[in-house]
Amino acid sequence: MTNSLPLDEIICQLQESWQNLPDQRKANNNKQYEVSDAALSAYSVFFMQSSSFLAHQRDIHKRKGKENVSTLFGVKKIPGDNQIRNLLDPIKPDHFHADFKWVHKKLAENGCLATFLDYQNTYLVALDGVNFHSSEKIHCDNCSHRQDRAGTTHYYHNAIIPVLVKPDSQHVISLCPEFIVPQDGHEKQDCERAAVKRWLLQHHGDYQPHQVTFLGDDLYANNPLCKLIEESYEQFFVFVCKPTSHTTLYEQLASSTKIETRQERYWNGRYGEIWSYRFVNKLPLRSGDDALLVNWLELT
């Protein structure tokens, strides 16, 4: 059994899968570029050591007589940056979800996915928002926006990028992203928490029969979201919980007589450390009768 998944095998799968991507252009005989070639060209950017897609291809062609994208990714005719955007922007991200699941299926078959199980036989999924576009001028209908104190409007694109992680490893496995974009029928702007809820709705059962422990910062330590994870989807979470945003919890903590402590010695590879733990169970995440009771842990 091997834990590798060759790039050639992935590219072959993507070539086949992306032949079925929707083409928003009107039917005619003068189409210069295929949507699948645009998708493969965009995918190839992740493997380049150049800030310019076309400049890199021209340099390779000049030195070796054949473009890198054609050789490695099987692109028949290489579109430029603008053509790639025009062809791919109208395509909904959902069309690419099956490709993520194909990769995960292959990683499960070759044993790689099993190496990410923790000591409780659950997967660890880190949740985080990523900003991948910001401008005061360039914007589209899918942009979020905010105004600063000077009244300047800032436009930006964010997405939730969940990844499968494991302790003491620098490697992660990317999961399907969820983009933070205006939602039909909603007047308020989209946000990270709403995007995470949509992601959970679609993907919470992807790794059954194994359960998932979700990891995240203070933003996710929110009563409705935590209840959704624990009660509706029967999964686990470990979220940062700051005193400034969880005053009720820390007031209860300050008056608690049930705080337990523990110390352990740990060798970090260079010198010894003493890890000090403080923990207590069943503290309310917020005020109110419907507050979720959570376990609190501090490590210093």
Pin down the residues of each PLM region.
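Gly/serine-rich nucleotide phosphate-binding loop at the start of the catalytic core
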Residues: M1-P79
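Contiguous, well-ordered alpha-helical segments that form the cores/surfaces of helical PPI scaffolds
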Residues: A39-S44, V163, R198, P224
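Short, conserved catalytic/metal-binding motifs centered on acidic residues
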Residues: S41, H56, G80, I84, ...
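Active-site-proximal, Lys/Arg-enriched surface segment
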Residues: R85-S169
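Short, structured patches in soluble enzyme cores that scaffold and shape functional sites
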Residues: N131, L164-K166, P177-V181, D218, ...
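Electropositive, glycine- and tryptophan-enriched low-complexity nucleic-acid-binding patches
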Residues: Q147-Q211
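Domain-level cores of phosphate- or acyl-group-handling catalytic modules
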Residues: E187-T248
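An anionic, glycine-rich sequence signature occurring as long contiguous blocks
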Residues: V240-T300
